[in-house]
C-alpha cells in the first residue's frame, strides 16, 4: 500500500501495468510525506521520481531515506526495499497524480490559452487566497511533467488548486485535463502560438 499523508492507494493494483519490480514486500505500507523530482531537495520519507537524468541520483536518494521511482534498468540499486522500477517514470507519475486527485475534496481550476495563462492564474490564486487555502502552478510546471507533480504537492487541508495548462502539441491539453479533472476551465484566448507544431489556429 502507498500512503501519502492520510490518503491510501493500492499501488500494486492501480499500477500493475507500469511497475516492473517492487523492492518492498506487498504487505508493507509505504508512507510518503512529499513527492520530489529534484535530487537536491530529497529528504527522508520523500518519494523521489527519477525523470530523464534523475535516474543517476537514485542511489543518493535512497541513502537519504527516500523511496525511489526509476525507469532505468541498467542502474543497480541492489534490490533496495525502497525502490520501484517502472516502465516509464513520467507515465507512472501521471497515473499516480490522477489517482491522488480522486482522493482530494478540493476545487480545481484549469487555465489554458495562447497567452495570459500565468497572469490569470496568479490573479485567480490571489483572489481565492483571501478566503481559502490552496496552491497554484509554480514556474513553468505547466506541462505533462509539471502538472502531475504540482497535483502531488497538494495537501489534505487545501481548498483549491489553480493549475496552468500549457500546450505545444496535439492532445496535450486533453492529457492534462484527464490527469487533473478540473471543476472549472478557463481559456484566456486562442492565438497563433505554437503554430510550428499545430500548423493552424483551428488545430
Give short role names for the model-derived ranges.
Residues 2-95:
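N-terminal leader/targeting and accessory segments in enzymes
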Amino acid at each position: 500500500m502507498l500512503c501519502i499523508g492520510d490518503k491510501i492507494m493500492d499501488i500494486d493494483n492501480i499500477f500493475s501495468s507500469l511497475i516492473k519490480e517492487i523492492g518492498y514486500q506487498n504487505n508493507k505500507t509505504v508512507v510518503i510525506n512529499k513527492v520530489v523530482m529534484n535530487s537536491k531537495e530529497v529528504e527522508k520519507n520523500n518519494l523521489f521520481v527519477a525523470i530523464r537524468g534523475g535516474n543517476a541520483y537514485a542511489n543518493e536518494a535512497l541513502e537519504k531515506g527516500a523511496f525511489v521511482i526509476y525507469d532505468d534498468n541498467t542502474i543497480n540499486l541492489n534490490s533496495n526495499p525502497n525502490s520501484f522500477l517502472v516502465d516509464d517514470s513520467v507515465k507512472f507519475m501521471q497515473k499516480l497524480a490522477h489517482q491522488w486527485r480522486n482522493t482530494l475534496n478540493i476545487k480545481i481550476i484549469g487555465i489554458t490559452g495562447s497567452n495570459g495563462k500565468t497572469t490569470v492564474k496568479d490573479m485567480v490564486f490571489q483572489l481565492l487566497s483571501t478566503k481559502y487555502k490552496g496552491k497554484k502552478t509554480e514556474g513553468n510546471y505547466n506541462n505533462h511533467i509539471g502538472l502531475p507533480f504540482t497535483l502531488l504537492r497538494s495537501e489534505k487541508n487545501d481548498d483549491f488548486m489553480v493549475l496552468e495548462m500549457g500546450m505545444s502539441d496535439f492532445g496535450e491539453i486533453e492529457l492534462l485535463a484527464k490527469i487533473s479533472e478540473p471543476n472549472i476551465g478557463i481559456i484566456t484566448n486562442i492565438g497563433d502560438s505554437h503554430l510550428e507544431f499545430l500548423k493552424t489556429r483551428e488545430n
